[in-house]
Amino acid sequence: MKVRVRLAPSPTGTLHIGTARTAVFNWLFARHQGGEFLVRIEDTDKERSKPEFTTNILEGLKWLGLNWDEQPIIQSQHVDDHRAAIQKLLDLDLAYRCYASETELEAMRETQKAQGQAPRYDNRHRNLNPEQEAAFQSEGRSAVVRFRIDDVAAISWKDLVRGPMHWRGSDLGGDMVISRRAPAKEIGDPLYNLVVVVDDAAMSISHVIRGEDHIANTAKQLLIYEALGLPIPQFAHTPLILNSEGRKLSKRDGVTSISDFQAMGYTAEAMANYMTLLGWSVPEGTDERFTLQQAATVFSFDRVNKAGAKFDWDKLNWLNSQVLHDLPKDQLLHELKPLWSEAGWALPEENWCLDLAELLGPSLTLLKDGVDQARPFFEEPTLQADGLEQLAMEGAKAGLSNLLDQLDSTSWDGFDVKQAQQLLTNAAQAANVKKGVIMKSLRAALLGRLQGPDLITTWGLLARIGQDLNRLRRCL
């Protein structure tokens, strides 16, 4: 059997990290098995589904490197198939029309609640005779379609993550609504549990991989598979992503959208790497830093955890920093250039920009850090408190003055590191201070602060665009 898996997001919002992690696990399993990864856009919620969310989801998957193998399926384009399946269930007497009004159903739930019972449909219209149906129709009542669920039904499957799973029909809340309310004798909009079964069968999906919050849906859907005589896929229910307090990660916890992570300066490689680790343990002796392609060679469900996976910002930041540190300077510049241009900076020649990217790379955690750290190379910096304090030290300005005098009288063809070090030594001796005082003071003059990348390389870059002398003079 060929492995075919699918991601089935609803375009009612941007690509959530939970959905993206599900996509990663689906993609890894498909690639490990030599199978196919498909995408189905579940847009049957007409009020909340928006084209811009579909675009965001697909672009997010592309950004993460999760390429799909067939054109994405749009669920709403197959509604006739869904209604045909409902009609088949009606014809087989495995489903029926329920005319109970919302007011009646709410009263039923309130009564159950008052009696200390869990709310569930009481199957009141399960066995209406033709005369009763005609009476409801003559009142102008609309109806939903419900799928019959026997309380004694035994539902079992072997979950690829959780092992044997066992449910009973009585656990599922009564007969299940499979289409929205519509005028009598019509079939309203088909609902999730029916639609998913029909679509997965039509797409020949072999494995359904999704979050553990779908376990109850799986129990319901297995009954529909059997009723329609459709082949049943294997199921894997992955752990939820949790916040620091152990609750399901939600929008209340802040950033959860992949596009937000992208805007914050996280790389696609680090995000995909981290999401793989959210609920999956690497084989012993395997580095926790890897590409998707590397992970696909060893991915298996026996290493997917049952317990929820806590989101760890420190781990994500570390992974992102490692990716940025190791990027070749041309690739790093490719990422940084748009950010520098967006900041309004006129960029010098390419080689200078490449050298700046190489200088900043080891100190970056996020791509956006490359804007803050590059700022003093494009704009004259404001002296910070630590810089002012350094320049006020005894001998600091005298040493910088001597350094400036040497530079004014020195002729060199390009910036020479050895000669620069000698100039600093000379300045320290002239001011009768340690060389470190002069180096810190020079950093304060060039960058406005004492923290920053390698001093000599920084000096060389600013010298190449004629800014070193200007900044020294400003501080004297």
From Swiss-Prot:
Chain ranges for the short sequence motif 'HIGH' region as given in the UniProt record: 9-19
Alphabetic keyword roster: Aminoacyl-tRNA synthetase, ATP-binding, Cytoplasm, Ligase, Nucleotide-binding, Protein biosynthesis
GO molecular function: ATP binding; glutamate-tRNA ligase activity; tRNA binding; zinc ion binding
EC numbers on record: 6.1.1.17
Positions in coiled-coil regions: none
First-level EC class: ligase
GO cellular component: cytosol
Pfam families assigned: Anticodon_2, tRNA-synt_1c
GO biological process: glutamyl-tRNA aminoacylation
'KMSKS' region (motif): residue ranges: 248-252
Subcellular location, record wording: Cytoplasm
Catalytic activity: tRNA(Glu) + L-glutamate + ATP = L-glutamyl-tRNA(Glu) + AMP + diphosphate
Residues noted as binding ATP in the record, renumbered to the chain: K251
InterPro entries, per the entry: aa-tRNA-synth_I_cd-bd, aa-tRNA-synth_I_codon-bd_sub2, aa-tRNA-synth_I_CS, aa_tRNA-synth_I_cd-bd_sf, Glu-tRNA-ligase_bac/mito, Glu-tRNA-synth_I_codon-bd_sub1, Glu/Gln-tRNA-synth, Glu/Gln-tRNA-synth_Ib_cat-dom
Assembly and interaction partners: Monomer.
Similarity-based family: Belongs to the class-I aminoacyl-tRNA synthetase family. Glutamate--tRNA ligase type 1 subfamily.
Record function comment: Catalyzes the attachment of glutamate to tRNA(Glu) in a two-step reaction: glutamate is first activated by ATP to form Glu-AMP and then transferred to the acceptor end of tRNA(Glu).
Designated name of the protein: Glutamate--tRNA ligase
Organism, scientific name: Prochlorococcus marinus (strain MIT 9303)
